[in-house]
Amino acid sequence: MLDNSRLRIAIQKSGRLSEDSRELLSRCGIKVNLHTQRLIALAENMPIDILRVRDDDIPGLIMNGVVDLGIIGENVLEEELLNRRAQGEDPRHFNPRRLD
């Protein structure tokens, strides 16, 4: 069970952004062992949980409040926005940000 007092971040468990996401977390000073097969990793030095999931699942996890933020590629974001528009939803509350 995830603790709601901790920040929950979803990243790809494998794929193009997996290693870049790990590197970003490390550069942010987040110490976490992501080299195991566990799907949930706890940061050692901050109240942060890292969830390793399929990239296509990350937008839904954010929208459903399972995680607080996630790292996805532009292709996944565009696909999710198109799906929400097709379903008649207003995708503006899905708030994309770019980190360079």
From Swiss-Prot:
Enzyme class: transferase
Main location: cytoplasm
EC number: 2.4.2.17
Entry's transmembrane regions: none
Catalytic activity, as annotated: 1-(5-phospho-beta-D-ribosyl)-ATP + diphosphate = 5-phospho-alpha-D-ribose 1-diphosphate + ATP
Subcellular location: Cytoplasm
A Gene Ontology molecular function term of the record: ATP binding
Biological-process GO terms, alphabetical: L-histidine biosynthetic process
Pathway: Amino-acid biosynthesis; L-histidine biosynthesis; L-histidine from 5-phospho-alpha-D-ribose 1-diphosphate: step 1/9
Xref: InterPro entries: ATP_PRibTrfase_HisG
Record-stated family: Belongs to the ATP phosphoribosyltransferase family. Long subfamily.
UniProt function note: Catalyzes the condensation of ATP and 5-phosphoribose 1-diphosphate to form N'-(5'-phosphoribosyl)-ATP (PR-ATP). Has a crucial role in the pathway because the rate of histidine biosynthesis seems to be controlled primarily by regulation of HisG enzymatic activity.
The protein, known as: ATP phosphoribosyltransferase
